[in-house]
Amino acid sequence: MENFKHLPEPFRIRVIEPVKRTTRAYREEAIIKSGMNPFLLDSEDVFIDLLTDSGTGAVTQSMQAAMMRGDEAYSGSRSYYALAESVKNIFGYQYTIPTHQGRGAEQIYIPVLIKKREQEKGLDRSKMVAFSNYFFDTTQGHSQINGCTVRNVYIKEAFDTGVRYDFKGNFDLEGLERGIEEVGPNNVPYIVATITSNSAGGQPVSLANLKAMYSIAKKYDIPVVMDSARFAENAYFIKQREAEYKDWTIEQITRETYKYADMLAMSAKKDAMVPMGGLLCMKDDSFFDVYTECRTLCVVQEGFPTYGGLEGGAMERLAVGLYDGMNLDWLAYRIAQVQYLVDGLEEIGVVCQQAGGHAAFVDAGKLLPHIPADQFPAQALACELYKVAGIRAVEIGSFLLGRDPKTGKQLPCPAELLRLTIPRATYTQTHMDFIIEAFKHVKENASNIKGLTFTYEPKVLRHFTAKLKEV
């Protein structure tokens, strides 16, 4: 099989979920009722759901079997200790707090790190800025809710869809250090390393870049949090593209990666393959005070620290899923599936970001050049794709980025992308071919697609619940 051009899915399908086919008229009515926001569509009205890979994929048989071991004790559950042991073995982190999902971890650690910086370094809350290679939307939202400005420092190649570059998710190291000096190191409560960089197109971060970033952070005594939703995909790209690690296992690369952070926050619904779950973990005793404070907040916001909003069976499933998500054959198939979709789209003239780990990212700005950024071309494209084929995708652009919380002005976005997110072990190559064919029809009518404007705009994380209409 080593010389075959295409390999089939490395799994057998045992349980299926029927989906219904709808008419164009039905879909047009549904998208209008949703306020031109695919997030607000009913799932039963979606034929292929590419909204997210977060908790929407299949689980392995070993994960499902592990649920039967669940200890549902309110405190001291043995299922918690199984999960904590997996974290120690995989990441080398000593302290584990389970959460219901990634944003549960964010709402705990962000205020704790801000308070710690204020008490120990005299942080000025009116001047504080957190840095990242690119903040995920909820991380940005929780930072802003806590009064912290966020600044993304990414390399110039990151959003140029005409450029191929191995590690488009990398930090701009000079920009990072320059930014720290500009705002004052004591006013930087944390740095977040997002692997892979979702908003840049699921693009990986190299180990060399993470090492250099961590060195800068240590120079200024700034804590680093690894946003770890797609840690296994990032490790796979390092193995494929960073020569020094080509003979390392995914497990070895993962362990090495986490030397270059102090904490990890994870939506386990991605690479750990679970329908629900998250993690907040600290590396060693140097962050025991943060761990203690976060445990206290966990009780109030998530649940007792040995379950954190998860039932025992879910913790057992997560303890196994962390391992199953690192399977090399599985990762090779998953990355190849994304590449197949990107190649097919580009063959019909649809410009995409280079293939990343979890999704194809269509350059909506180039497909719909007549729609200005403030009329959200990628959101308009998402609505058209649903009308044409019942495919639900998600905008990653100006609509998602939102407004400056201080000025109320739209933040400038480096690219207007439509994310076609592939749930794990859910769709086959035939589905990918259908998506490509759908874009042929969309492309034929591209010049007639209209921009969008708000009828309802929430102040925080607007893309989830906003409503729009055609201009």
Swiss-Prot record:
Its EC number is 4.1.99.1. Pathway: Amino-acid degradation; L-tryptophan degradation via pyruvate pathway; indole and pyruvate from L-tryptophan: step 1/1. SUPFAM superfamilies: PLP-dependent transferases. The modification N6-acetyllysine is found at K5, K115, K156, K450. The keyword Transcription does not apply. It is an enzyme of class 4 (lyase). PROSITE patterns: BETA_ELIM_LYASE. The modification N6-(pyridoxal phosphate)lysine is found at K270. Keywords: Acetylation, Lyase, Pyridoxal phosphate, Tryptophan catabolism. The keyword Membrane does not apply. It catalyses: L-tryptophan + H2O = indole + pyruvate + NH4(+). GO terms for molecular function: tryptophanase activity. It comes from the Bacteria. Belongs to the beta-eliminating lyase family. PANTHER family: BETA-ELIMINATING LYASE-LIKE PROTEIN-RELATED, TRYPTOPHANASE. HAMAP family: Tryptophanase. This is Tryptophanase. It comes from Escherichia coli O157:H7. The gene is tnaA.
